[in-house]
Amino acid sequence: MEKTLKISKIRDGTVIDHISAGKALEVLNILGSNNGSISIGIRVNSKKMGLKDVLKIENVFLEKEDLDRIALIAPEATISIVKNYEIIEKFNVDMPEKIYGIVKCSNQNCITNANEPVKTEFIVDSRSPVTLRCLYCNRSMSGDEIIKNLI
C-alpha cells in the first residue's frame, strides 16, 4: 500500500514548483523573511523532473526582482498565483537578458564594489547552467558563486 503525504492547499499566495531537488531552501533564503506561512516539499516525486522541490507561501505575492532571483537559482521553476484556493495565474520564471542590482560582483576590484554609486549589472551569458558576466569588469560567475553574491 502506497502512502502519500501531500502539502495542503493555500488560500492565497504563491506556489513555486519545479525547483531542482535540494534547492528549495536556497530559493526560500533569497526571498528573505516575510509574514507568510510556508510549506516546503523537498525531493518530491515528479514525472517531469524525477525529483523536485516545491514551496507554498501563504499571503505573499512576488515582485519582478524576486522572480529574477528565483530564475538565477531555479531557472526551470513554475510560479502559480493562488487566490481563494484557485490558481488564477501560472507561468514559468523568465531569465532576463540582463540582471540589475540583485547580484554583487565577486571581483573585489570591480567599480561596483568601490564606494561609487554604481548599480551592478550583469549580462546572462548562459541559461543552463546559469552564467553571468559583469558589464563593468567582465568577471564571469556561475552556480554557488552567484548564490553567494545575491544581494
Curated annotation (Swiss-Prot):
GO terms for biological process: 'de novo' pyrimidine nucleobase biosynthetic process; pyrimidine nucleotide biosynthetic process. Binds 1 zinc ion per subunit. GO terms for molecular function: metal ion binding. The keyword Aminoacyl-tRNA synthetase does not apply. Zn(2+) binds at C105, C110, C134, C137. It comes from the Archaea. Its cofactor is Zn(2+). Keywords: Metal-binding, Pyrimidine biosynthesis, Zinc. Involved in allosteric regulation of aspartate carbamoyltransferase. Belongs to the PyrI family. Contains catalytic and regulatory chains. This is Aspartate carbamoyltransferase regulatory chain. It comes from Picrophilus torridus (strain ATCC 700027 / DSM 9790 / JCM 10055 / NBRC 100828 / KAW 2/3).
